[in-house]
Amino acid sequence: MQEIIEAVDRKLLEQELTPDKFVKRTNSGNNEIYIVTCHNSPNITREIGRLREITFRDAGGGTGLACDLDEFDLDKDTPFQQLFVWDPREKEIIGGYRFIHGKTLKRHKDGHIDTPTSELFHLSDTFIEDYLPHTIELGRSFVQPNYQPTVNLRRGMFALDNIWNG
């Protein structure tokens, strides 16, 4: 098992929190929701990967790598987008999930769609053609340990609700 990477400098994270990535304020807690990719926010993406690995290891899982980022997060053409909740007071990422619109998924010459779901299930041609373009694949959702109710009730009270606001 690899040692988890160091936290990304908060100043670097804040520099990437630009208005074009801002979605909205949360309904509870006055936190902020953003959407980024590895291309427009490499530091935030790295911190998300670090926090996911910490969170999943804490729950008995994890990749065992230094940072939980894979080919879907880092794709050069159409990476998954990262929706996350930012706590502006503590300057921390609370949690989030990655997603991709089904219509942006590319079909290989052999008909295979490259997505985490296709690694778990056989996607029929009918599903790929008629339904997939109207879907959004969500995955790797997490609430980092410092915002889970079992660790900090005050912080954790609305953490998951804040993510669902997105």
Identify the residue ranges that each predicted region occupies:
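Generic detection of long, well-ordered alpha-helical segments
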Residues: 3, 7, 38-49, 157-161
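Intrinsically disordered, low-complexity boundary segments flanking structured domains
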Residues: 16-23, 69, 121-129
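A short helix-loop-beta-strand connector motif used in the catalytic cores of GNAT acetyltransferases and
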Residues: 73-84, 107
